[in-house]
Amino acid sequence: MPENNIELAGNTNIKTSQVDKSVDTPADFTSPEVLYNKLIETIRQYHPSSDLSDIERAYKVAKEAHEGQFRKSGEPYIIHPLCVAIILAELELDKESIIAGLLHDVVEDTVMTSEDVAREFGDEVALLVDGVTKLTQLNYQHDKIEVQAENLRKMFLAMAKDIRVIMIKLADRLHNMRTMQYQSPAKQVEKSRETMDIYAPIAHRLGISKIKVELDDLSMKYLMPDTYNDLVKQVDINRPGREAVIKRIIKEVGMH
């Protein structure tokens, strides 16, 4: 990721794109501690006897690594990996996946290296983080020729030697789409198009309907805002019903 690095106290290099002091912390800001507790509670629901000491350690390492970094919303950056980890826990993934979710941006966006991750959490977690980093570096440019999107989807799947890498990347994209309102209109359209062309179809292929449907929903919100808003206002139906309508609209306009 070609960004200018800046030096902060403690010899921590961070990407300038992730520091936005002009943005106030949102009023509905949820503290990292609250999110961490939610993560632990979610894991306990499907793995009540699991030793979570490594997850706690990964959270502390990620929080320290991302210290001084902020999201476009003004929130501390650690909010993002925490939310990614929560999504993975909601899907009942294993401990290594959740640890990798907490650490998925440290190699790309902090001074931590893959070797650091391996030394602290083992080769398995390091390989997951490295896989997510490589997928993030895939260059996507929308083209109307469907075969190009299909080729990129195949490359995406082929590059991920472990299916958990894709799960982490899907969770990463889902949280980014959930917070897309803080991006510029151009970025909203770009990322929504990419999400609908690449990520939603991959989620569908993997049978993760929960993520696939929400990615479609959020993408449509920015790609077809008038249609989406009319749908929300005029169609007084439950969420599954709205999802069915969105699916039909996407099919009619030729989106994946």
Residue ranges of predicted features:
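Active-site helical microenvironments for divalent-metal-assisted chemistry
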Residues: 1-256
